Regions:
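Extracytoplasmic "Venus flytrap"
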Residues: 1-19, 33-43, 138-142, 190-195
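Hinge/cleft segment of the Venus flytrap/periplasmic-binding protein
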Residues: 244-288
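An alpha-beta-alpha
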Residues: 18, 106-153, 254-271
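Hydrophobic alpha-helical segments within soluble ligand-binding/sensing domains
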Residues: 87-128, 229-250
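Short, polar/charged alpha-helical segment
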Residues: 11-32, 147, 151
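Short, well-ordered beta-strand segments
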Residues: 1-3, 80, 132, 212
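Beta-alpha junction/loop-to-helix N-cap segments that form part of ligand/metal-binding clefts
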Residues: 34-96, 190-214
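Pocket-lining segment of extracytoplasmic ligand-binding domains
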Residues: 140-209, 215
Length: 288
């Protein structure tokens, strides 16, 4: 059973990677049930409860609210998360980076090196002074990323200010304030931002303020550059973990959290052109 929080580019890619890994191993012998929560965590619980009632062999929880719903619903069915930034925060545990969670939960993380994303701001905008940190306050993983990146950026001499929005309803207004007060904006890996990147773009492009994004999907919608993991890849890694579990080769309880170690500097040529920016040659065009 696959529970995906909402349909946007990054999460869709993770689901596809997962399914491709299962199909490569099992062909048509695997039955996949999919549920999309439409961005509502309450729907995640309903979808997961259905999977538990059907006694599925494994659950893929795509994004943090899906994972927390699955963890609450069963302690026996193997659960693999994907597109979850920090499992410790998601599950109220101690830091779990590179660790085995134990129990019935493991998965893959979409956390990119935040220090290197801060370095990207310095590389591309060395003369900027004010960096706006735009994020959804309702997403614990976004708060974690913002706190971490702020520390790196302030250590480089930037003045940082947080611009938190509650949901899509105040996103445009908060983005406008950030654009008015910032030389450059950083947006972390954030589901609300990813699902509404065009709303951010409609503000920052006319304002002439560049966005450094935490992942490729957001960058493709409103950013100029990102250092991004591949969501397809972390989905595929989760799928390969699922194959091992379903074949009885390995227990979920002994599996460490998986990461995509292949990182690419990517840029959005369209928005760069609109803002009059030229990217260094080692930046690859998104979709190119």
């Amino acid at each position: 059973g696959i529970c995906q929080l909402l349909p946007h580019t990054a999460l869709n890619a993770a689901t596809e990677g997962f399914k491709d890994a299962l199909k490569a191993a099992f062909g048509d012998a695997v039955e996949i049930k999919e549920g999309n929560a439409g961005g509502d965590p309450a729907n995640c619980a309903t979808i997961i409860d259905g999977f538990v009632a059907d006694n599925v062999d494994l659950i893929l929880a795509n994004a943090t609210p899906s994972l927390t719903a699955a963890a609450s619903a069963t302690d026996t069915i193997p659960i693999l998360g994907t597109a979850v930034t920090n499992y410790g925060i998601a599950l109220n545990l101690d830091s779990t980076e590179d660790k085995v969670l134990g129990g019935n939960i493991s998965g893959t993380s979409d956390l990119a090196p935040l220090d290197q994303q801060a370095d990207m701001v310095k590389e591309l905008f060395p003369d900027a002074k004010n960096v706006g940190l735009l994020y959804c306050t309702a997403e614990a993983n976004s708060v974690y990323q913002i706190e971490t990146v702020q520390g790196y950026l302030e250590g480089m001499g930037y003045t940082c200010k947080r611009y938190g929005f509650n949901d899509v309803n105040d996103l445009a207004a908060v983005t406008q304030t950030a654009a008015d007060e910032s030389d450059v904006i950083y947006v972390p890996t954030d589901n609300t931002a990813a699902d509404n990147a065009s709303t951010i773009a409609d503000v920052v492009i006319p304002a002439g303020v560049p966005v450094i994004a935490g992942e490729e999907g957001i960058c493709g919608g409103c950013g100029v550059a990102t250092l991004s993991i591949s969501y397809y890849e972390i989905g595929q890694i989760a799928g390969e973990m699922a194959v091992q579990i379903l074949k009885g080769e390995k227990s979920v309880s002994e599996m460490a959290i998986g990461f995509d170690t292949t990182l690419d500097k990517k840029c959005n040529p369209t928005i760069c052109e609109q803002l009059g920016l030229t990217m260094p040659e080692d930046y690859v065009a998104i979709g190119g």
